[in-house]
């Protein structure tokens, strides 16, 4: 269908008045009669526009402090009747109902109000549940063949332009598109109410869960060029601000989130480098330059083309260090002008800014037609459990290194083993099906590290899960490891403890596993 519909009368009732004055003046200029509810009518009259009060159209006043103002047959009849149905037209004429050709409505700010409230069921939250607005939006969207419905200020300009070019009319295609937006808007609104009230009832994992996603970015492709991809967010905008560089790829985004999540686990100035969604270098220091050097030294071959995250604002000295190596992107809480100028000399580097840790309450992962949902792994220690299970206790330096290793290994793909000093990873074994193979891989990377660096004074291992056999401890001993941190919990824990005692290794059990798949 290509049938145009001329807009003669518009009902406007909005909470968000962004762009409304310009839009309403444009409608008035095109000869559209404006009808409005009390608050919006007051706004439009203050802008010098002639406006009919809705109560004049319905013959019925607003009641119950505005809870009932648009729920009236003269409103919904005017919106819902089919203009090409003789029986409908006769009813409308006989009852003296005046047409409404356009509905402009957005809804009470429920999400914003709930976000500020102490409890989901506070009176102010309840009062910001819109009833009349969604009802009108659904009516107008259902009858899009005859009525135009707008619920987003960003559509005002496009609609006005089309009407100006079409003697005040809108095409079927435009009305159809606006219909979809209206139903999406009401669905999201109802979902927000439902999820907020489930939260208020402490329903952590309810029988049904509604997740609303907003498209924030088109991507060139997915993990591989033959896969189509797009970025959606549970918020309206992408949570990193991009200050410079090429558009982010699917893989860049995965690494950006991974490296940022990891670097936020450290209080000291820290640098984390990711490649293929796992760390290839983690370092801390008194200053960021030291942290970067510690992280980069771990595995510069793998770090080439990776993504770097810093947990402190970028400054000139660290920007100069980063500018000398090839990376895809850098993330930091902030950048001074000098550091930005230095980094921007590399035209393709993506410069990302974010000043808060990841805060999502849940992680979602699709598996076929199903979705796995879990709490994020944000716990470093469970009830401060840090139990030495061996005869030898860790020294102060070893304990510091073990805590660094434990904070680091939780971000490595399982099976994960990491060799560290007190402030730097020096060998990472990731993604092996056998834990002893992860130890051997970390050892291989450590041998490469020693070709360019001195052996650290303290060398420890962190393991994301228990050692199922003593072979992992034996392999660690061959590397010169003096202390190990692991969750414990294997039926063969005693064998691993005995092996550690034989080698004079101190071993800590945390009682907390950090699988990452």
Swiss-Prot record:
GO terms for molecular function: IMP cyclohydrolase activity; phosphoribosylaminoimidazolecarboxamide formyltransferase activity. The IMP cyclohydrolase activity resides in the N-terminal region. Pfam families: AICARFT_IMPCHas, MGS. Coiled coil: none annotated. It catalyses: (6R)-10-formyltetrahydrofolate + 5-amino-1-(5-phospho-beta-D-ribosyl)imidazole-4-carboxamide = 5-formamido-1-(5-phospho-D-ribosyl)imidazole-4-carboxamide + (6S)-5,6,7,8-tetrahydrofolate; IMP + H2O = 5-formamido-1-(5-phospho-D-ribosyl)imidazole-4-carboxamide. Pathway: Purine metabolism; IMP biosynthesis via de novo pathway; 5-formamido-1-(5-phospho-D-ribosyl)imidazole-4-carboxamide from 5-amino-1-(5-phospho-D-ribosyl)imidazole-4-carboxamide (10-formyl THF route): step 1/1; Purine metabolism; IMP biosynthesis via de novo pathway; IMP from 5-formamido-1-(5-phospho-D-ribosyl)imidazole-4-carboxamide: step 1/1. InterPro entries: AICAR_Tfase_dup_dom_sf, Cytidine_deaminase-like, MGS-like_dom, MGS-like_dom_sf, PurH-like. Belongs to the PurH family. Residues 1-151 form the MGS-like domain. HAMAP family: PurH. Keywords: Hydrolase, Multifunctional enzyme, Purine biosynthesis, Transferase. GO terms for cellular component: cytosol. CDD domains: IMPCH. One of its GO terms (biological process) is 'de novo' IMP biosynthetic process. SMART domains: AICARFT_IMPCHas, MGS. This is Bifunctional purine biosynthesis protein PurH. Its EC number is 2.1.2.3, 3.5.4.10.
């Amino acid at each position: 269908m290509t049938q145009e519909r001329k807009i003669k009368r518009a009902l406007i009732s909005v909470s968000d008045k962004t762009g409304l004055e310009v839009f309403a003046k444009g409608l008035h200029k095109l000869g559209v009669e404006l009808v409005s509810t009390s608050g919006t009518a007051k706004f439009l009259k203050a802008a010098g526009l002639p406006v009919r009060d809705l109560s004049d159209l319905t013959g019925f006043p607003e009641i119950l402090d505005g809870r009932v103002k648009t729920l009236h047959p003269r409103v919904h009849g005017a919106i819902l009747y089919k203009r090409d149905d003789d029986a409908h037209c006769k009813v409308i004429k006989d009852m003296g109902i005046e047409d409404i050709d356009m509905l402009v409505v957005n809804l009470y700010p429920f999400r914003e109000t709930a976000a500020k409230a102490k409890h989901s069921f506070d009176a102010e939250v309840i009062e910001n549940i819109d009833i009349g607005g969604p009802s009108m939006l659904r009516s107008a969207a259902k009858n899009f063949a005859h009525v135009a419905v707008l619920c987003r200020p960003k559509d005002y300009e496009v609609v006005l332009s089309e009407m100006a070019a079409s003697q005040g009319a809108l095409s079927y295609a435009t009305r159809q598109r606006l219909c979809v937006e209206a139903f999406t808007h009401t669905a999201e609104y109802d979902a927000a109410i439902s999820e907020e009230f489930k939260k208020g009832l402490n329903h952590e994992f309810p029988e049904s869960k509604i997740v609303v996603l907003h498209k924030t970015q088109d991507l060139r492709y997915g993990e591989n060029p033959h896969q189509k991809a797009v970025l959606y967010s549970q918020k309206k905008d992408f949570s990193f601000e991009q200050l410079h560089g090429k558009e982010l790829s699917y893989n860049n985004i995965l690494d950006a989130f991974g490296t940022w999540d990891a670097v936020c686990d450290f209080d000291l100035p820290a640098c984390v480098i990711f490649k293929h969604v796992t760390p290839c270098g983690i370092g801390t220091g008194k200053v960021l330059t030291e942290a970067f050097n510690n992280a980069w030294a771990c595995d510069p071959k793998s770090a080439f083309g990776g993504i770097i995250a810093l947990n402190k604002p970028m400054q000139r000295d660290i920007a100069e260090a980063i500018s000398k190596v090839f990376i895809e992107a850098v993330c930091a809480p902030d950048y001074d002008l000098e550091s930005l100028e230095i980094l921007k000399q590399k035209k393709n580097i993506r410069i990302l800014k974010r000043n808060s840790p990841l805060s999502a309450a849940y992680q979602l992962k699709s598996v076929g037609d199903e979705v796995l949902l879990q709490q994020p792994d944000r716990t470093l220690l469970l009830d401060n459990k840090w139990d030495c299970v061996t005869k030898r206790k860790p020294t102060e330096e070893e304990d510091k290194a073990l805590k660094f290793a434990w904070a680091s290994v939780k971000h490595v793909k399982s099976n994960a083993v990491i060799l560290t000093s007190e402030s730097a990873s020096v060998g990472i074994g990731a993604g092996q099906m056998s834990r002893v193979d992860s130890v051997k891989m970390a050892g291989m990377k450590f041998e490469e590290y020693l070709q360019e660096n001195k052996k650290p004074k303290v060398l420890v291992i962190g393991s994301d899960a228990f050692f199922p056999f003593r072979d992992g401890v034996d392999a660690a001993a061959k590397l010169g490891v003096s202390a190990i941190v692991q969750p414990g919990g294997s039926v063969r824990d005693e064998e691993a403890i005995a092996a550690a005692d034989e080698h004079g290794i101190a071993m800590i059990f945390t009682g907390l596993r950090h699988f990452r798949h």
